[in-house]
Amino acid sequence: MFKPKLKYSRSGMPVISNEDIDTLGERMAVDFDYTSLFNPHPIDIERFVEKYLKMPIEFMYLSHCSVYLGTTVFQTTDYLPVYIPEDKCADYAHVEAGTVVIDGSLDKEDQEHRLRFTLGHEGGHGVFHPSYFLNTIGSSERDDTGIYVRCRSDFKVSGRDFSGFRSLTDAERAEQQANRFSAAVLMPRSAVKILLAGRPYNRTEGWIVSAMKQISDTFNVSKEAAFYRLKGLEMIEEHAKMPF
């Protein structure tokens, strides 16, 4: 596994640009599957997380309403909050450090795109954020602060809206970096450009819709993820709206 040399802020947050995350994600994707660059296809993201990043994957219900899609555990705990649907009650689970826990609602065929992006996202936390979250242990009244990060389904930071290293709290920046990493691994920058090289380039709505479909079909991602990847790579305008 390629191990990046990262610079960190005092809080333990990586100081890294979106472009450098793209470069790192692509390098890791190619290191894992060297054919992924010049023959664009869906990366086996589950195997990438488990075998390449060496992060075991478990499925548990993280809430009763799917508000949390994934959790990365940084320190072994007996107290990860989970929901037991059979008993309709909350409980705690033992989870080892370095484990990715995916909400059970994503373990369904019609949730494949969301599952794939969530796996990449949690992998991003594993690559970038152990130092940050472990540094926060004991920093609040909550006993579980820093032991794990629970990623909400309603968090959205996309495109260039939060480029660079400004405007975000550390917690928000961690989510943005994990999102960018997931996009970079699932849809490597060079592979996207190779994929779209054969079509006349313009920024019309028709071109955007067609490019989104091609990216979605080729990399097995949602059209929404494809749209924000195009925006993040500045292939469409920052203010462009989803065409559906």
What are these model-predicted stretches?
Residues 1-244:
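Active-site hotspot residues in diverse enzymes, especially metal/ion-binding acidic/histidine motifs
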